[in-house]
């Protein structure tokens, strides 16, 4: 097995086509095909399924690619250290639910290391995507929450994917509403107070059950529901429709502006927000710095 073979399979997976990977790598298509075939035979793994539209990664190929990315990242770090720091391009990826403190911490990491070149990724995603990203090593760590409602299901998924959860802090539920919302002057609100207002939540795709929901009180029935995919849309709807969402209460006025406020929600529940990582994996300096930065924002 050679590093070049691993680079080929990762690029083909990204492109979904050997032809496109060949064009981007400036390597002939037959050379890439032969190299991947040799790698599959040597490792005894079937990485790609061939279709008339290109290639797709097989189930066992996803696992292989996760390890391949980790090997390539480590090789890049090694080369950068001993072949000249100027050639090193740091890589760091985080997958998270829609938390402003996660964005602020990401900014802090970039400012702390302030490299001339870097390749960092922050993905705000659906819950199951966060777990898959960390399991397949697309992200070094993920951020999500556990509660009495979802803990059993999420922890089972983590065990299945050889991931571990480390709690960072526990939060009582709050609601985000616009600053001129009719309930904005309340010291706290109840679910009954909110009945007449649209409930805003993050869509979870085919995993759209309360086990994967980002909103702690998703098990309650609402008359008005709106699901979105991104934070900006959710806040725009909150301001335009007097909608609300349930959250941890940690808010960043630097990111969200003064138009959104947080009010305690009067329910007897809590959420434990933490990070997920691969079992027995040592975090990079960027991962460690990111966790330290999060602790400064909560």
Would you name each region that the model predicts?
Residues 40-57:
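A short LG(V/I)-centered, amphipathic sequence patch enriched
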Residues 42-43, 64-86, 290:
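Alpha-helical linker/hinge and terminal dimerization helices associated
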Residues 135-139, 145, 204-261:
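Hydrophobic hinge/microswitch elements
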Residues 157-173, 177-199:
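Flexible hinge/capping segments at coil-to-helix
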């Amino acid at each position: 097995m050679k590093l070049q073979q691993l680079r080929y399979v990762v690029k083909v997976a990204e492109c979904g086509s050997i032809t496109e990977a060949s064009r981007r790598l400036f390597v002939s298509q037959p050379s890439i095909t032969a190299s991947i075939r040799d790698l599959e035979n040597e490792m005894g793994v079937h990485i790609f399924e061939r279709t008339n539209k290109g290639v797709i990664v097989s189930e066992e190929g996803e696992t292989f690619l996760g390890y391949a990315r980790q090997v390539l990242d480590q090789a890049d770090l090694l080369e950068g250290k001993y072949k000249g720091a100027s050639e090193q391009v740091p890589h760091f990826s985080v997958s998270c639910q829609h938390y402003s403190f996660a964005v602020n911490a990401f900014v802090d990491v970039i400012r702390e290391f302030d490299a001339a070149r870097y390749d960092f990724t922050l993905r705000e995603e659906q819950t199951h995507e966060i777990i898959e990203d960390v399991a397949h090593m697309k992200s070094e760590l993920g951020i999500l929450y556990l509660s009495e409602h979802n803990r059993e299901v999420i922890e089972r998924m983590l065990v299945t994917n050889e991931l571990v959860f480390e709690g960072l802090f526990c939060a009582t539920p709050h609601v985000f509403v616009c600053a001129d919302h009719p309930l904005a002057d309340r010291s706290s609100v109840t679910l009954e107070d909110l009945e007449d207002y649209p409930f805003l939540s993050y869509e979870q795709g085919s995993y759209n059950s309360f086990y994967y929901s980002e909103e702690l009180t998703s098990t309650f029935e609402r008359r008005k529901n709106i699901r979105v995919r991104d934070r900006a849309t959710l806040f725009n709807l909150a301001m335009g429709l007097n909608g609300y969402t349930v959250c941890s209460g940690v808010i960043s006025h630097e990111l969200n502006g003064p138009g959104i406020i947080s009010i305690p929600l009067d329910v007897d529940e809590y959420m434990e927000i933490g990070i997920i990582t691969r079992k027995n994996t040592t975090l990079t300096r960027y991962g460690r710095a990111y966790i330290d930065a999060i602790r400064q924002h909560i």
